[in-house]
Amino acid sequence: MFEAKLKSRSQPKLGALAVTFPIPEERYENVILALQNLQIGDVRKQDCCIESIRAPDCPALNRMTGTMANADELDWLGKQLESFDRYELLQFNAAVERFGLSAADELIDLSFCAREVTVVSDFNDLELVGKRHYLIVHGACDPKELENLDGKETALALISGQPGYVTRYGVVYDNGMKLEQAYDRKHLPPIWMAENCILELKIRVTGEDDPKKQEWVQLPTSQIKLERAMLRAGIASCGEMQMLVSDSRFPDAVDCALDVEHGSLFELNQLCRACSNFKKQDFVKLGAVCQMAKPTCAANIRQLAENLDQFDFAPNVHTPEELGKYMIQQSGHYEYDENLEEFYNYGDYGVKRILQDDGVFVDRGYVCYHGTLTLDELMRDDPAESYQQEQEAKMEGMTW
C-alpha cells in the first residue's frame, strides 16, 4: 500500500529504514528488530520519524512526512487502506486534505468515516454523481429504487444544498460527517479479517470490563506481534489474560473443543499455523476428526491437524449403505461399473468397512483412523515444548 522511510529523530546518524506497510507477516519480526537497531519501534511510543513516503495509490499520505508515528499504527493504517476500493481511496485522499490531517493516529480515525463524504472529480456525468451520492448517504438501497432515481436532480440538489471544499482530488461534500476519535492512541482498533486469518481473538487483562482496553489479534501471526499486542493491552503474562473469540473459520466442532477461555494464546497460534494451508474441505475433515477423537485443548487439535492424512473421511455419509456406496463409487479405491449396479450390496460392504476400520459416523460424515499410535498418544503434546512456550510468553522485564 505504501512505503515509509523511518528514522530516529534524536539519533538520525543511525540511518533510516524503508518499510513497506502493511508489513508482510513473514517479515514482521525482522522489521521490528531492524527498527529497534535504530532505537525506534517501541510498542507504545510514537518514536518513528517519517523521513519520506511513497504512496502512488494514496498520495495524501505524503502529508505524514516529518511527523512522528508508531510502527504498529502505520502497519494498521496500511492494512486498513489495502481494503479500500478505488473510490474509497479517493474519498480518503480528499478528506485528508479537506480536514488538514497529517498524523498517523488522525488518519486512523479518518479511515472509519472517510466513506461518508461525497467527492466529485468529474461534473460531466451528474447522473452518476447523484446515484453515487445517494448510495453514500443511504448506505444501500433496492436496485430498482436506484434505477428509478433521478441522479442528475440528486446531484444538483447536493451541489446547491451544501458547501463544497475544493481539493486536488475533487470537490468534497461532508454530508454532515463528524471526525471523531475512534482510536484511543493506546489500543489499536479492530480491523477487517484478513484472508489468511483463521481465528480472531479479543485479548484483555482478566477482569477488565472497558471494551476500549483490549486488543484484537488475528491468528496465525508471529510471536512478537502477539507479545506487542499483549503489552498494548497491559497484559504482563499469559496468566493475567482473558481471551474471547471474535471470529473463526474453524467448524463448530473445532470451536467447541478449543476451550479458549482456559487455553494458551500461543498454542492457539500454533494450531492456526498448522492449518494455514488448509482448504475448506480440510477444515470440514478436521471438524469430523475432532468429533471422533474428542480433543480437550488447542494442542490436541494441532496434533490432529498435523496428522490429518492418517484419517479417512467420507463427507455427508451417515448410514452403512451410504458408506458402501461412497467407497465403491467415489473413494477411488475401486473401479465402479454402473452396469453391475444391481449386484452391489452397499449395506453389507458398509458394515464390513465400519468393523474393519473401527470408524464412526459424526455430524459431517464418516471418519476412521488408520495410524499406528492410539488417538490419545497421537494427541499428546510435548510437555517440554509447552513449558518453553509459556516461559517465552512472560512479559516481565521485556524491553522494546
Q: Each PLM stretch: what is its role?
A:
Residues 30-102, 224-296:
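Structured domain cores in non-transmembrane regions
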Residues 185, 374-390:
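Eukaryotic nuclear/nucleolar intrinsically disordered, charge-dense low-complexity regions
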Residues 119-126, 295-343:
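Intrinsically disordered, low-complexity segments enriched in Gly and acidic/Ser/Thr residues
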